[in-house]
Amino acid sequence: MKNEGNILPFARGTCVAPFGKGCADYVAGGGGSGEVTTDRVYNLIQGLSFAELQGEITYDHALADYYTEYVKRLYAKGMKPGLIPEAPFPSELAAKANTPGMVAVIVISRFSGEGWDRCCGSKLHSVLKNDILKQEEKIFPHGDFSLSDEERELVSQVTKQFSKVIVVLNVGGMVDTAWFSDNPHVQGALLVLQGGSMGGIAIADLLLGEENPSGRLVDTYARSLDDYPSTEGFHATSNSVAYTDDIFVGYRYFTTIPAQNKNVVYPFGYGLSYTTFGKKVLNAAFDGADISLTVQVTNTGKFRGKNVVEVYVTPPQGILRKAHVVLAAFGKTQTLAPDESVELTFRFPLARVASYDEKRAEWILEKGDYEIALGESCMDLQPIKLRVQLDDDAVVEQLKNHLVPSQLFQRLNADGTYEQCAVHAYEKDSCVLHRQSSSKLEGIVPEVVGQGYVDRTMESTWLSEGFQEVANGKQELESFIDSIDDDALIGMCGGQPNTGLANTYGFGNQKKYGIPNMMTCDGPAGVRILPDCGVTTTWFPCATLLASTWNEELLQEVGRVAASEVKENNFALWLAPAVNIHRSPLCGRNFEYYSEDPLLAGKLAASLIRGVQSNGVGACVKHFACNNKETNRKESDSIVSEQALREIYLRQFEIIIKESQPVAVMSSYNKINGIYAAENKELLTDILRGEWKFEGFVTSDWWNHAEHYLELKAGEDLKMGCGYPKRVKKALRKGAITMEDIKGNVRHLLQAMLRLD
């Protein structure tokens, strides 16, 4: 992020003074489904130790021991990585370490997780708090976006005493960066996010120049939490979130709304390298539909490295809401030696930057000039000499309106004003059953139905009859489904008991019909097996860090490797990736998601899914859709315009479905415009299957608050962690659902199972 005077990478023999509890308190990833049971997590001090053993650098052992012992004591008291207060500043040790040539490295770490949102100061706090959030508030009374008072004192003391200072950010999401960007006494900064179990080693390699940074920001880093338009209403109520920022999310807001660009510290797409690169457009053409570009990238510096090419489009400002600039394509080079060149070729439809017209229910390219540019970030653009002009509006796709809001009271315009919207009451609840209380829906273990544990490597056993005939092409799937009794069909639409190492339950499990019990597993940072099982797996970097590579080829390889562990441990479906948009820095689960930009998130996640499914296991993309707040997530209503839904919050899912066809999609807990996502036919059937041609099955998130029969009728095929067959049968007797509906759900499940090894 910052490298004044080329302070990085360290020269051989550099002396390093580690500061901040973060140098020992390394946060490998976030909490919840993204937490992995692994053999060991390496922190920066351990990374420096390895480098010292190799004769690369030396480091101050007294400081390292001070922070190591401090962190060890608090871990022993049950505190989690990233959720311990900053250590008192070691004045005497710092004075001894302040020798000529010494470089101080300050590490700032943050932790967040599933089920709670990041603390944000008393002015904005949610009234709903769990124990972890209460603990976080004690450590960060001003919110964890900003430095704590203790961290500010640490920075103040270090920058006073040391002439060379580097900052390392071990965080899972957006934080304040103005404090070092504006500080001339901090010469360098690395955003390392959360790098999994090997993160501390990787940080040391980056500091030493063993590896050359090549990432780009996937989010906008603003001066203040208040600069993000999503902040004001984030905790206005725990029952809903009004997406009044509309399509202006992240860089779309800061580059479009007047005067907001001044609040950006580091823009989307920004990133530095230890080397330099030159770019030259060799060819640019527009054939009336597609834009073609050939870009030559040359390493003009002294270090080996990779480079990202970002292509942006500025559309004409017509009648419809539009962002000033939109990412349209991207690519990454292989590692280039000094003076080495490579050509990257791009071809993408202009329709990629179309706008959704709610009045006419169509994707449209408005007439006018479309400016194409290469960018070193979304705010550092070099125009390409290419005439892209439409003389008339062009309809890209005609659709039907879906998910139209009735409670959105206002929405942001491109000039910074707000359009006032008509508000209507929600329609009456269509459920014919008395809904169960939330206390009856939480954490119920599936009843034991069908067969127990079966080794999935023994194909001759787990598909010995019935369904095996379908798999072998000896029986049509439809006739097989017709042979299954109603109780078994209904039972298959709910989660099944754990077997083997599983802790997130299975699906299928009808021994009578030769249908195996296929296990699922969390999570987005690797296979998550409970610690008491005695099995460890790889803790991969968090999704935001993976996305920061802007490297589709790498993401596909990560998917392939992760799937090998899924398969090795007898799981059939990996509950990953998670691709919700980084609408607000406050979302506690942002580390698990990719970006504020749907194209970047969609393309990279699609690559990961292709890698996963090339290994014979299934990927389950989640959370569909608008899961951008963890507080009261099972009841919160995401109130959002159809244009914002289609252009921002559904777009990455659309890309994923069309480019990688995941085996499964997981619906989100929340409501969307008054209807649970899990009960929303317009979302799960009309859009997902009708418009996007999804071929897999849809599962709920675990123990949501939706009604099972309404989920089935909407197009959700599997309720996890368990189903409610008695309630489904009651709805059948009332005529609210039919067995033909349920057969359709089972068909989706069985078709997906046939795709798995």
Task: Specify the residue positions occupied by each region the protein language model found.
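Glycoside hydrolase catalytic-domain context in secreted enzymes
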Residues: 1-356, 362-380, 396-757
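Short beta-strand elements
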Residues: 381-397
